[in-house]
Amino acid sequence: MSLGAWEVKVSTNFPQKVATGIAQLDEQIIGAEYDAVAYLGSQVVNGTNHAVLAQQTILTGRDTKNAVVLVFNEKPKTIEVALASINTIVKGNNEPGGIDVNVTTEIPAEAKAALDAALKGFVGSKVEAFAYIGKQVTKGIDYIFACEVTPVVQDPVKTISLVKVHSIDNTLEFKALFSDEKNNTKLGYAFTW
């Protein structure tokens, strides 16, 4: 891994300092709750940044849910991590046609079937869903996943992407969050469909 680049390393196990930081979030932030789902990777820059996929619940009368990437920073020679940023990657909306966010690593059977159907015959990249983000009812049902996408080439650059499956016609839409690429130092976010 080169200095400043993200190293993709998806896991449902969190480094100890990151797990402690996650546990303290609900005490530190008023008006929202966070449910961490997956560790996405790390970046070495001014210490070590750690990216975590989570569900954010805004505590209002409607309890809106969003998919977010939490970035924690671990400074050298410190015993804890600090929350550096909260990046909204999918905004939930309780209105008709809005995205019903329910971030989980337990992918619902109907969503998995839609993804499998859309990936049938798909070539060029290996797409592995590690989390279900939610669904949207428009013309048919669209499902959104967090996936590891690895091109089928020599020396592939793995990417963490949001993948939207349009189940009515079995098509896919990709939005990259970040990758292993040497020069990729930014975490992309704030997507709206």
Predicted regions and their residues:
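N- and C-terminal low-complexity/disordered segments
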Residues: 1-193
